[in-house]
C-alpha cells in the first residue's frame, strides 16, 4: 500500500468527528484503512501516495466503518470514483 497511512488515519478521524488525540479506535480504523486499500488494489487499482488515492482510500474506509452493520451497497458516488480511478490507470 503506497498510501500514507498516518495521513489517512488523521483524515478518517476528521471525517468521523473524532479528536486527533483520541487513539482508542486507532487499531480498528487502521485495519479499516488497510482493508479499504486492499479492496481497491484487489480491483486492479495501483495506489500511489497522491492525495487523490489517499482520499479515495479514506472515503472507502469511512464508508466501510459507518455501514459495517447495514446491508446497503456501496453508494453510487463512491462506486463511480473507484471506477473512474481504475479507468484512468488502464
Regions of interest found by a model, annotated:
Residues 1-53, 85-90:
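Conserved short "hinge" loops at termini or chain/domain junctions
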Residues 40-47, 64-72:
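Amphipathic alpha-helical interaction segments
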Residues 55-67:
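Short, hydrophobic/amphipathic alpha-helical patches that form generic packing surfaces
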